[in-house]
């Protein structure tokens, strides 16, 4: 994961939004778009192979970079919201949102930030890969805000579980 594509090639493959203007009334996109959210100590370069595959298959996509790298997970929700909006405007459909590791927690925090009745219209499905939903033991050693938020059984993780909407 922390290879060449992380620090140096993260912008080698651009986001792909085939229709940058809103769809005409009655017009339907043929492929659902995807938003890709990386994990801790990564950037959008994590998704380069996925981005190439999505474009080859005709799926609009946006891969975000969560900044600042050691910021609060809650502060990343605006980045997710903007990416979802971009994909939805390009396709006319709510996207699939994929989060890896901490990215899955960011997506859950974004869902929690939405008005209760709007989540279904904003996102088609959420997929999390390797997400520490209950936290991680490594979080107790972290000096970063987001690392501490991911502490196993920590306050932030418990609060997220209590406040997020029912699935």
Task: State what each model feature region is.
Residues 1-34, 57:
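Flexible, membrane-associating and regulatory peripheral segments of lipid-active enzymes
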Residues 12-14, 150, 167:
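Generic preference for hydrophobic/aromatic residues in regular secondary structure cores
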Residues 35-45, 49, 55-165:
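Serine-dependent carboxylesterase/thioesterase catalytic core
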């Amino acid at each position: 994961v922390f290879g060449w594509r992380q620090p140096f090639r993260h912008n080698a493959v651009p986001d792909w939004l085939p229709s940058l203007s809103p769809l005409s009334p009655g017009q339907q996109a043929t492929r659902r778009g995807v938003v890709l959210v990386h994990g801790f100590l990564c950037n959008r370069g994590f998704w380069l192979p996925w981005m190439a595959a999505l474009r080859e298959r005709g799926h609009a996509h946006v891969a975000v970079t969560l900044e600042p790298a050691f910021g609060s997970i809650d502060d990343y929700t605006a980045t997710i919201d903007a990416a979802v909006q971009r994909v939805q405007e390009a396709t006319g459909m709510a996207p699939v949102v994929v989060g890896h590791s901490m990215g899955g927690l960011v997506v859950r925090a974004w869902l929690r930030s939405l008005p209760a009745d709007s989540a279904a219209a904003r996102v088609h499905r959420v997929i999390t890969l390797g997400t520490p939903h209950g936290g991680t033991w490594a979080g107790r050693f972290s000096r970063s805000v987001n690392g501490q938020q991911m502490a196993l059984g920590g306050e932030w993780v418990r609060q997220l579980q209590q406040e997020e909407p029912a699935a």
